[in-house]
């Protein structure tokens, strides 16, 4: 009785901004550097996505707002087969939300921990796919600065996708980046050098060094240098000076040559463009159009019968999370009712001011709507202009000069 109506997808006004109610929460699957991630289904289209959500108050208290805004500003101008693409961004009183491509194959770190053996053929294809993504980012003046197995997700067929742009930076013209950012074991020598003596700065080659470290680790199970998060910088720089990278005698000559050129300490001599990669004899037989079209099948395909992530994330969300997502609707209704009776506990003035600024400055994005407006051609026709005028002007070496600085003088987002 009435069953027919229950199966009809809800109809949302095309002009209405996408919000939390437009999605059904299915399960928690992970934690990023600035938030948690769950699988969601859009109620009207039934399409599945990953939804990252970040608590506003925690972001303000931890000085993370700028990084969240940076990631949003960069991702709204990008779309590529080997990136995790942004579809929607919106907010409510508690959280900021980013809805992105759902990739259920897990990240490469997870598979390394599961002792997956990656063949040379598989890693060769990964390098090619990631090279296409890095070339695309470089075209729009973006350095990712955190390429590593943790930030490379697999789709169900085993193709790679770069995620996590919260420490990425946009360069203007021929300028170089000058702040130390990244994950130590994957950071290029010139990034550490900038920290020690100012140096000349660094540019796009740092991402290609990180690609080399990642490829080496996938093949061997450990990294070319014994660097950890606690390793002192002077010790790291000394390692680069005196230690030689050891390449397995079982690897083919072409792979060793490719890795050596990616792990060249001098950024001027390092492989750091798609043209450089394509010039390698080892990759002469590669059909690059087929790579771009995902027509070449990777040697490793994730297990479709299991969720390729740590199952404890779901337990944490259900049991340990003080503000679980599945109870949000009821919780917000209760807060709104309490606010209307003036019976709520006010936050301290400075925090309240920061949260209000976050609300005003938050970037709302809807790729589905954008595509409709552009005639369903699937192309972001104004991509170059939007990246150039909006993102580059605001993001200079990771410093977003326009976000929160005018109303939060005590640095809640620095």
UniProtKB/Swiss-Prot annotation:
Catalytic site: 146 (proton acceptor)
UniProt keyword terms in alphabetical order: ATP-binding, Kinase, Magnesium, Metal-binding, Nucleotide-binding, Serine/threonine-protein kinase, Transferase
GO function terms (MF aspect): ATP binding; metal ion binding; protein serine kinase activity; protein serine/threonine kinase activity
Keyword Transit peptide: no
InterPro entries: Kinase-like_dom_sf, Prot_kinase_dom, Protein_kinase_ATP_BS, Ser/Thr_kinase_AS
Record bears the keyword Cell cycle: no
Region span, Disordered: 374-400
Coiled coil: none
Catalytic reaction annotation: L-seryl-[protein] + ATP = O-phospho-L-seryl-[protein] + ADP + H(+); L-threonyl-[protein] + ATP = O-phospho-L-threonyl-[protein] + ADP + H(+)
Cofactor(s) needed: Mg(2+)
Record-linked Gene3D superfamilies: Phosphorylase Kinase, domain 1 (3.30.200.20), Transferase(Phosphotransferase) domain 1 (1.10.510.10)
Annotated Protein kinase domain residues: 23-283
Enzyme Commission number(s): 2.7.11.1
Annotated positions binding ATP: 29-37, 52
Polar residues bias (residue ranges): 388-400
Family stated for the protein in its record: Belongs to the protein kinase superfamily. Ser/Thr protein kinase family.
Protein's UniProt name: Serine/threonine-protein kinase 32B
């Amino acid at each position: 009785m009435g069953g027919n109506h229950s199966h009809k997808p809800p109809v949302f006004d095309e002009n209405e901004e996408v919000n939390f109610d437009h999605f059904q929460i299915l399960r928690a699957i992970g934690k990023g550097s600035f938030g948690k991630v769950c699988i969601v289904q859009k109620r009207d289209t039934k399409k599945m996505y990953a939804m990252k959500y970040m608590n506003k108050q925690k972001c303000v208290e931890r000085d993370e707002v700028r990084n969240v805004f940076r990631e949003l500003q960069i991702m709204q101008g990008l779309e590529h087969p080997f990136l995790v693409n942004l579809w929607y961004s919106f907010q409510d009183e508690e959280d900021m939300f980013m809805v992105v491509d759902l990739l259920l194959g897990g990240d490469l770190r997870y598979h390394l921990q599961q002792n997956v053996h990656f063949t040379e053929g598989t890693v060769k294809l990964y390098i090619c796919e990631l090279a296409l993504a890095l070339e695309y980012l470089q075209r729009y003046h973006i350095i990712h600065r955190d390429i590593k197995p943790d930030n490379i997700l697999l789709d169900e067929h085993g193709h790679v996708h770069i995620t996590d742009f919260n420490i990425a930076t946009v360069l203007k013209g021929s300028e170089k980046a000058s702040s130390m950012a990244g994950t130590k074991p994957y950071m290029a020598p010139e990034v550490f050098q900038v920290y020690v003596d100012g140096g000349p700065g660094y540019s796009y080659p740092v991402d290609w060094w990180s690609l080399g470290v990642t490829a080496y680790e996938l093949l061997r199970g450990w990294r070319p240098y014994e660097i950890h998060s606690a390793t002192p910088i002077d010790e790291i720089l000394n390692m680069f000076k005196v230690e030689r990278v050891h390449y397995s005698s079982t690897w083919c000559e072409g792979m060793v040559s490719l890795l050596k050129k990616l792990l060249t300490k001098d950024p001027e001599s390092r492989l750091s463009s798609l043209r450089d990669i394509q010039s390698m004899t080892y990759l002469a037989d590669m059909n690059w159009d087929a790579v771009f079209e995902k027509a070449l099948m990777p040697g490793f395909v994730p297990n479709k019968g299991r969720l390729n992530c740590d199952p404890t994330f779901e337990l944490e969300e259900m049991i340990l999370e003080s503000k679980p997502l599945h109870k949000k609707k009821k919780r917000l209704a209760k807060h709104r009712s309490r606010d209307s009776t003036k019976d709520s506990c006010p936050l301290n003035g400075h925090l309240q001011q920061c949260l209000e600024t976050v609300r005003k400055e938050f970037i709302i994005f809807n790729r589905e709507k954008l595509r409709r407006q552009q005639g369903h051609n699937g192309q972001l026709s104004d991509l170059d202009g939007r990246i150039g005028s909006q993102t580059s002007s605001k993001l200079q070496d990771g410093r977003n000069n326009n976000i929160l600085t005018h109303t939060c003088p005590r640095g809640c987002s620095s």
